[in-house]
Amino acid sequence: KVHGSLARAGKVRGQTPKVAKQEKKKKKTGRAKRRMQYNRRFVNVVPTFGKKKGPNANS
């Protein structure tokens, strides 16, 4: 029923080195955020052939 014993719970998270949070610029909210989304998705799109690349593609 369970994949692996509960003794292994949180193994990977425990192993990863702690990285301190960075200070970042505040995100836009409401209308301004939607405007940014719209621009990102529909306005400055690069015409490509074949399969569409996802928003998180790294190539």
From Swiss-Prot:
Q: What gene is behind this protein?
A: Fau
| GO MF terms, alphabetically ordered | protein tag activity; structural constituent of ribosome; ubiquitin protein ligase binding
Segments crossing the lipid bilayer:
none
Annotated region described as Disordered, given as residue ranges: 1-35
Supply any other comment. Answer: This ribosomal protein is synthesized as a C-terminal extension protein (CEP) of a ubiquitin-like protein.
Q: Which residues carry this modification: N6-succinyllysine?
A: 51
Q: Which keywords appear in this protein's UniProt record, sorted alphabetically?
A: Ribonucleoprotein, Ribosomal protein
Q: Which GO terms describe its cellular component?
A: cytoplasm; cytosolic ribosome; cytosolic small ribosomal subunit; extracellular space; nucleus
Here the segments flagged for biased composition (Basic residues) are 23-35
Record-level GO BP terms = antimicrobial humoral immune response mediated by antimicrobial peptide; defense response to Gram-positive bacterium; innate immune response in mucosa; modification-dependent protein catabolic process; protein ubiquitination; translation
Please report the name of this protein according to its UniProt entry: Small ribosomal subunit protein eS30
Q: Which family does it belong to?
A: Belongs to the eukaryotic ribosomal protein eS30 family.
